[in-house]
Structures are given as structure tokens and as C-alpha cells.
């Protein structure tokens, strides 16, 4: 799966799969890495409903790995402000993009060095889930 320019706060890849198949594979990849999908937000539909605007397909998955979330909350009670981990599938210029938040970048703002190993673990799992879409 080809890479796309990823922002400092995320990891993105382009896939040749149709949108719905990419979304299903991302959900399966997240599950394989221990994440459950807590919410699924269809941004295209919501913006059409609320603003009457058209945009390409865009779905956000709010994913949580319960053991890691529990461990993180034990180390940093306010971590809930940064949960769940978001993953996305969207259409851009005729391509389907799949991605996930960079947990290490996100958790760096917490300023708790004890969380760094967990952040790396979460990042590796999210990247494997994204890469599994290929």
C-alpha cells in the first residue's frame, strides 16, 4: 500500500481497495490488534445533514484497546481527554486514504515519560492495523 504524506499527528496510507472494503479491513485490523470500535462517525452524512454541504466519503472510527486504556488511565487520570484513538478512511482526489492518529505524538503533550512505552505500543498496533488494509 503506497504511503501518502502523513501529518506529524498521524499515519496515512493510500489503498487501491474500494472505500467500503477498506473500511471493513481497517475495522478487522483494529480488532486483530485488540481495539474495539466504540463509535463510527460518517462525516459526509453528518455535514450533509447539519450544513447541507457535499463532501467526499469520510468515516472516523473511535477505537479503544481496553487493557491499554486501563493502564494509561492508571498512569494519567486525565488521559480520557485524548481517548479514544481515532482511525479514518476517506476519499481524496479519487483515492481512498486509510490512517490513524500517531499516539506517541498525541501522548507527548501529556508530559508523562512513564507513558512513552505504552504510546509506542499503541502506535505500533495502530500502524499494523492501517497497513493490514493493503
Task: Identify the meaning behind each predicted range.
Residues 86-112:
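Beta-strand/loop substructures that line and gate deep hydrophobic ligand-binding cavities in soluble
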Residues 23, 65, 123-126:
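Short amphipathic alpha-helical/adjacent loop interface patches that line ligand
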Residues 17, 21, 42, 117, ...:
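Conserved active-site and cofactor/substrate-binding residues in soluble primary-metabolism enzymes
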Residues 36-88:
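Compact, glycine-rich, soluble single-domain proteins
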Residues 27, 44-45, 127:
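Short glycine-/small-residue-rich flexible loop motifs, especially phosphate/cofactor-binding loops
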Residues 2-33, 131:
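Terminal, regulation- and interaction-focused segments at domain boundaries
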Residues 109-134:
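Well-ordered alpha/beta subsegment
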Amino acid at each position: 500500500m503506497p504511503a501518502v504524506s502523513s501529518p506529524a499527528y498521524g499515519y496515512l496510507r493510500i489503498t487501491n481497495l474500494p472505500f467500503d472494503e477498506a473500511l471493513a479491513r481497517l475495522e478487522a485490523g483494529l480488532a486483530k490488534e485488540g481495539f474495539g470500535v466504540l463509535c463510527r462517525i460518517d462525516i459526509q452524512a453528518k455535514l450533509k445533514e447539519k450544513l447541507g454541504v457535499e463532501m467526499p466519503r469520510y468515516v472516523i472510527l473511535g477505537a479503544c484497546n481496553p487493557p491499554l486504556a486501563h493502564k494509561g488511565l492508571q498512569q494519567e487520570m486525565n488521559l480520557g481527554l485524548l481517548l479514544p484513538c481515532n482511525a479514518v478512511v476517506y476519499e481524496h482526489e479519487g483515492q481512498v486514504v486509510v490512517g490513524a492518529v500517531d499516539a506517541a505524538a498525541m501522548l507527548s503533550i501529556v508530559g508523562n515519560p512513564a507513558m512513552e512505552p505504552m504510546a509506542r505500543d499503541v502506535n505500533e498496533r495502530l500502524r499494523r492495523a492501517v497497513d493490514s488494509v493493503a
